[in-house]
Amino acid sequence: MRVGLLFGGCSGEHEVSIKSAQAIAKALASDDNQTKYQVSPFYIQKNGVWLGPDVSQQVLDQGVPWGDQPVTAGQRWQFPPEAARMEVWFPILHGPNGEDGTVQGLFSLMQVPYVGSGVLGSCVGMDKLAMKMVFERAGLPQVNYMGVERGEIWSNPCVFPALCEKIEAQVGYPCFVKPANLGSSVGIAKVRNRSELEAALDNAASYDRRIIVEAGLTDIREVECAVLGNENPQASVVGEITYDSDFYDYETKYTDGRSQMHIPANLPKAVVNQIQTMAIQAFKAVDAAGLGRLDFFYQPTTGQIVINEINTLPGFTAFSMYPELWRASGVEFPSLVDRLLQLALDYHGRPGHQ
């Protein structure tokens, strides 16, 4: 079966996508997978231009982005001719224009199966405000939050102080300010007072027109659970992230030695069971498919578990949390990649799931 491995993309998570694609390509080259799949890599430059398998393989081999050249709008409509021959796609594009329903819409339009959630699940999984509304409707406990529009921050200086007062009254300090549609903790800030709030809102507005402000919790443990499947998804063991920084920001995530994964997490069995149940509930609530990583906060002093977010296309390097959780659950990396491709054929190959 001909598999298109799509990576790179126009988001700030371009380099992470390359690393994920390298790991997936290696897994597809395993003895068992080589007999099933013929892989062709396709790299999307930061300027949005698709490159064919020959150059894309060079990017995989070198592990660094391909140099961009000035392009016209018409060049972004040109796809490598080899793309038309792919029977199933494995998109590993992180962030905007990759896991937000855009490329999923393209594949759906072309009526070709692909790994991961469909357009709806991807959209809801990317937009933190929409996601929280869906979680709320599903009865999943969350931290207190409120949504903010860029226009409330930039358009009228007289409105801005009133907005800050509203946030202080409804959410309070400490709180986190986040762009609604970015991943990997890009643009996120922890704030403790009015001056930090003003700066964080201004910064978040430079990334997105929709911003979310969430209440901060104290004495929490950050735990994660991986989900695999379509209509009858399974939950992995639960893992925990620890770090020395103030919060789990971009630098902490992607700097060696700044954070540690503990798999499985040292948690009471009842807590693990509850997290796994909530993970599957959240996965279904957003209409996810194939894979998803669910992030939670656990407060040992109160026993409270609240859902933070779902990532419908999580990092997929050899040492990323998602594959590591499944490895600890008895599913090795090559088998995981194989199962995801089979789930794609099962889900997106049927009517009503495009």
Curated annotation (Swiss-Prot):
Record-listed Mg(2+) 2 binding positions: E309, N311
Pathway noted in the entry: Cell wall biogenesis; peptidoglycan biosynthesis
Domain ATP-grasp: 132-342
Positions that bind Mg(2+) 1: D295, E309
Residues the record lists as binding ATP: 168-223
Record flagged with keyword Glycoprotein: no
Pfam families linked: Dala_Dala_lig_C (PF07478), Dala_Dala_lig_N (PF01820)
Gene Ontology BP, a term: regulation of cell shape
EC number(s) given by UniProt: 6.3.2.4
Keyword Ligase: yes
One cellular component (GO) term of this entry: cytosol
Broad class of where this protein is predominantly found: cytoplasm
Comment on bound cofactor: Binds 2 magnesium or manganese ions per subunit.
GO MF, any single term: metal ion binding
NCBIfam families xref list: D_ala_D_alaTIGR, PRK01966.1-4
Family, as annotated: Belongs to the D-alanine--D-alanine ligase family.
Job of this protein: Cell wall formation.
Protein name per its UniProtKB record: D-alanine--D-alanine ligase
